[in-house]
């Protein structure tokens, strides 16, 4: 997340003792908008946990369910967005598919215009992924841009939302109420939601890096009441406050972050998750159910 282009590129003011600006170390960007995120959190770590057939199983083929519409919030420079697109369509490196955009279309947003511009330039599937600059916490802009995209397909909500390592940055910059509102907006916009919350140790590390570099501390860090086991906190907010149901946890990444799949009660009634997917996941030990 970023508030300005200067912050997005990691620039800081020069001092008398410095001729060049310091460069933010990975993870120290105040809004999570570091320029080479995928170098230290590669997409493959998430992909190995997610069944490639997940979306096809959740949304069986029919005119009403195509294309599957996804919302990727906090897409950074698009590396993970593209990787997810290829993964769920079973596309290999260098491979294209003329019908890909008819099967799946992702709207990917980030607050940093520099990162969004890079994502647009490097995207190998311009017909299937749309990148926009958006401060998701700006209600007016969010409503206009997302409604405009959905109306192109005659839809009012997204089939699935992706919130990958974003919740901490919302929480640190907007406080407890901001996190609650962020999850409320997502749950109202998406029938299914895949969330990768950062654990509390990442909060402490992010704050420590800012202090180490002499940057302004996060306004809300010391006053946050929602803390501790952040995966459980996210589950509680989405299920108890926002009417979603936790379907499963696909496991943890190498850097110890859970991949949690939620669905709205309406989705539960109209499109129950296939039992075959559940059983296959259990057999592969890739899906751990929180209710067990």
Swiss-Prot record:
Q: Which residues form the Bin3-type SAM domain?
A: 53-274
GO molecular function annotation: O-methyltransferase activity; RNA methyltransferase activity; small RNA 2'-O-methyltransferase activity; tRNA methyltransferase activity
What's any GO biological process attached to this entry?
tRNA methylation
Q: Please indicate if the UniProt record lists Manganese as a keyword.
A: no
- Main localization of the protein? cytoplasm
| Cellular-component GO terms for this entry | cytoplasm
Q: What class of enzyme is it?
A: transferase
Region Disordered: start and end of each range?
1-22
Instruction: Give the family, as the similarity comment puts it.
Output: Belongs to the methyltransferase superfamily.
Describe the protein's quaternary organization and the partners it interacts with: Interacts with DICER1; the interaction may be mediated by RNA.
Q: What name appears for this protein in its UniProt entry?
A: RNA 5'-monophosphate methyltransferase
What organism is listed for this UniProt entry? Bos taurus (Bovine)
Q: Which gene encodes it?
A: BCDIN3D
